[in-house]
């Protein structure tokens, strides 16, 4: 079978080595004669999986000891509610920075629980979409926390700055599409959350990193499965967790460690992004409308000069083994999501196709 490269924004491509191991272990895991999907989450065998996954994740991101790591249900949208429900405390407002679709979605959900102070960070510079630098973000004095999304998958916009708003500002961030792709100074954040389906593992699992002094503040109406304190007190097993997603994510963590960790991913991801943006920038046939300072390394949207060719581009790229390149309905065009599991050879295959397609149709 020909090599297939999956450029889906999520659920996304998983490392081939991880899928191969999961396939080999699927029906007889650890010599038990059963699948990991069939064992009790409270049995010693799965407890070991959970403990190793947390340890490896902590190692990969150098998570400080005063932070808890939770393995949850609900995805990023669940955390849009969980963040205000857990850390508002006795305050009624929080700062929200709007830089794209997912930040706006978090704001919409937060309005159910508080009065968001919304700062629109979106700007246009020389006809290109950009984000105001953090030094220009206008935060309020009475906010319980500040929330932003470092990587907007749909808009292809990234905020790569590290927050530095002082120790009194609790920063909450949606890292769903950029977690583990580059080093993070976890100590600059109060809460980091990420849906698994892009850079961690299969859909169904969400990881939360929360500073321990923020526990114990949950609203009385907070559902128990979203309550950080309850999840922490029960080792993320207050109810039956998504065990297979947890197991597979653990395999991804081991794959990452075996391949140089987050620092190595950072370098490879930079190479992949430079290759793809280079083809776009050196062409009149393709275009990307995001300012270079805010271009995402994970999600690269681009348009063809003649949108009438979009359908043909998608058909021919799919036939060439380059799948899921259709852009989000909100922005149209194309989008290549090049998360950790996408090898450099996959991006090279895409850029070779793009050059050849332009030669034939440009």
UniProtKB/Swiss-Prot annotation:
It comes from the Bacteria. It holds the Pfam family Aminotran_5. L-glutamate binds at residues 9, 42. Its main location: cytoplasm. This is Phosphoserine aminotransferase. The gene is serC. Pyridoxal 5'-phosphate binds at residues 76-77, 102, 153, 174, 197, 239-240. The lineage of its organism: Bacteria, Pseudomonadati, Pseudomonadota, Gammaproteobacteria, Enterobacterales. Homodimer. Belongs to the class-V pyridoxal-phosphate-dependent aminotransferase family. SerC subfamily. It comes from Escherichia coli O7:K1 (strain IAI39 / ExPEC). Keywords: Amino-acid biosynthesis, Aminotransferase, Cytoplasm, Pyridoxal phosphate, Pyridoxine biosynthesis, Serine biosynthesis, Transferase. One of its GO terms (cellular component) is cytoplasm. Its EC number is 2.6.1.52.
């Amino acid at each position: 079978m020909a090599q297939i490269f999956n450029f889906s924004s999520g659920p996304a491509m998983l490392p081939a080595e991880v899928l191969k191991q999961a396939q080999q272990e699927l029906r007889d895991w650890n010599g038990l004669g059963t699948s990991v999907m069939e064992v009790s989450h409270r049995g010693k065998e799965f407890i070991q999986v959970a403990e190793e996954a947390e340890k490896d994740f902590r190692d990969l991101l150098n998570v400080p000891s005063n932070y808890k790591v939770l393995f949850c249900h609900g995805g990023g949208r669940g955390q849009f509610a969980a963040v205000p429900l857990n850390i508002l405390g006795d305050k009624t407002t929080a700062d929200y920075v709007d830089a794209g679709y997912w930040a706006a979605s978090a704001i919409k959900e937060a309005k159910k629980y508080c009065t968001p102070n919304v700062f629109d960070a979106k700007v246009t510079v020389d006809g290109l979409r950009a984000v105001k630098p953090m030094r220009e973000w206008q935060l309020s004095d009475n906010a319980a926390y500040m929330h932003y999304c470092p990587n907007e998958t749909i808009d292809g916009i990234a905020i790569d700055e590290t927050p530095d708003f002082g120790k009194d500002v609790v920063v909450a961030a949606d890292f769903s599409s950029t977690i583990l792709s580059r080093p993070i100074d976890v100590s600059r954040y109060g809460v980091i959350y990420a849906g698994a389906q892009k850079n961690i593992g299969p859909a169904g699992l969400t990881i939360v990193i929360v500073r321990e002094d923020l526990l114990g503040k949950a609203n009385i109406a907070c559902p128990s499965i979203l309550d950080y304190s309850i999840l922490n007190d029960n080792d993320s097993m207050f109810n039956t967790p998504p065990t297979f997603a947890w197991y597979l994510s653990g395999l991804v963590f081991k794959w990452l460690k075996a391949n140089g960790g987050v620092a190595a991913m950072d370098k490879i991801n930079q190479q992949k992004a430079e290759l793809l943006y280079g083809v776009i920038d050196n062409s009149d046939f393709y275009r990307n409308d995001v300012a270079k300072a805010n271009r995402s390394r994970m999600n690269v949207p681009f348009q063809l000069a003649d949108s009438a060719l979009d359908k043909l581009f998608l058909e021919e790229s799919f036939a060439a083994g380059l799948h899921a390149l259709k852009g989000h309905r909100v922005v149209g065009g194309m989008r290549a999501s090049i998360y950790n599991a996408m090898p450099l050879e996959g991006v090279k295959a895409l850029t070779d196709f793009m050059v050849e397609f332009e030669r034939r149709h440009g």
